A protein has these predicted regions:
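Long, low-complexity N-terminal extensions
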Residues: 1-170
């Protein structure tokens, strides 16, 4: 006698979501930012890989938002692209409306609010927002996927952070 399947459609959705997050977390990447008295240094790798497959060697994880602010991200590439395009559009709208560029602090709060607004279906991107503040000092803001952020002296994001963080700690 054949037994009926106990799996329902409600058990498949969490499996799919967990698979997508597992797959996205296996993408090798690294973003590093260091803030100084009057500078910010940002570095990010350009490789997209999954397992043993290299999908691209020329992908830029860093996007210039204003003359004083850049963002670098690690995570799912589609979400990174979408987030960067959304932030660029919001910066252009701000510039058109107020006839000036937003400050690094304003963009830090904007990014946190944007990520938090998607907390129930998060944007799978771990970001470092870097720039010069109003006093001309370097600022690095580190984010998680749901918008929590903190101002840092240096930041490391991505699956390669286990290798990058000890170097910066010294």
């Amino acid at each position: 006698m054949a037994q009926a399947s106990t799996r329902t459609s409600t058990t498949r959705a969490p499996l799919l979501v967990s698979f997508l997050f597992f797959y996205a977390s296996k993408v090798n990447q690294l973003s590093i930012a260091i803030a100084g008295q009057d500078f910010v240094m940002v570095a990010a790798d350009t490789r997209i890989s999954s397992g043993f497959s290299i999908l691209s060697r020329e992908y830029s994880r860093t996007t210039k938002l204003t003359e004083k602010t850049v963002i670098t991200s690690s995570g799912m590439v589609a979400d990174i692209e979408n987030l960067h395009k959304l932030l660029i559009a919001k910066v252009k709208t701000y510039q058109r409306q107020f006839k000036k560029s937003p400050s690094t602090e304003s963009l830090a709060q904007l990014l946190g609010n944007t990520l938090y607004s998607r907390r129930f279906m998060p944007i799978y991107a771990f970001n470092l927002l870097c720039g010069l503040d109003a006093q001309g000092q370097g600022s690095v803001y580190g984010y998680d996927a749901i918008g929590s952020f903190d101002k840092l002296t240096y930041g490391v994001q991505g699956s390669g952070s286990q290798l990058g963080a000890p170097i910066l700690d010294n």
